[in-house]
């Protein structure tokens, strides 16, 4: 399995990740705000067998993105969308996938994501929060944790099991508080403890207090 992470990820966290994953660190995107310019969920988006990124970012990170596509067997889609230093112009790729749903702020979401959602039969759930993926810890198909009430209201109405927690307790320099989605990764452990199925697992980045 591969793990895609910030180029600034601390050495001790990388050491832990490398016990389970092949780690690929993405280079920074200076078109994004400095506190988040290494955050992969603002630079790339995966849906099924497709990976979407911007032309301009691909010119910076082609080696890493090509490696991701090769290792994961993904087809690359390049978007000509622009990105900006201020919200909501920085969150075009920050959509969350849960089951056959794409949770996002539709007006801020990259048009290639919306096009692909339509072509592949995904339902787009429109929420007020542009940093949707940052705001959601994806537990499994159809289950999330979030501190965002606007997201929780929409996901609950659409049959997604949602745990609403209090905001805060996660640090993100430059912002009032961090987001649970940005502090976690979601993956599957295959055939763990002789159980013949895929089990959801969560890796928490440093300590999480709810």
Segments predicted by a language model, with ranges:
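Histidine/cysteine-enriched polar flanking segments
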Residues: 1-210
């Amino acid at each position: 399995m591969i793990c895609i992470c910030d180029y600034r990820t601390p050495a001790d966290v990388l050491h832990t990740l490398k016990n389970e994953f092949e780690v690929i660190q993405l280079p920074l995107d200076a078109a994004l705000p400095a506190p988040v310019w290494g955050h992969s969920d603002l630079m790339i988006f995966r849906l099924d067998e497709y990976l979407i990124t911007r032309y301009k970012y691909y010119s910076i990170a082609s080696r890493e993105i090509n490696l991701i596509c090769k290792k994961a067997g993904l087809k690359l889609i390049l978007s000509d969308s622009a990105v900006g230093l201020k919200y909501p112009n920085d969150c075009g790729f920050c959509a969350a996938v849960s089951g056959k749903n794409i949770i996002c702020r539709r007006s801020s979401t990259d048009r290639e994501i919306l096009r692909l959602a339509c072509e592949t039969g995904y339902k787009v759930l429109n929420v007020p929060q542009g940093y949707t993926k940052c705001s959601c810890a994806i537990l499994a198909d159809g289950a999330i944790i979030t501190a965002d009430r606007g997201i929780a209201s929409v996901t609950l109405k659409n049959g997604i099991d949602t745990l609403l927690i209090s905001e805060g307790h996660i640090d993100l320099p430059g912002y009032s508080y961090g987001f649970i989605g940005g502090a976690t990764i979601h993956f599957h452990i295959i055939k763990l403890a002789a159980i013949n199925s895929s089990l959801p697992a969560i890796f928490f980045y440093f300590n999480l207090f709810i």
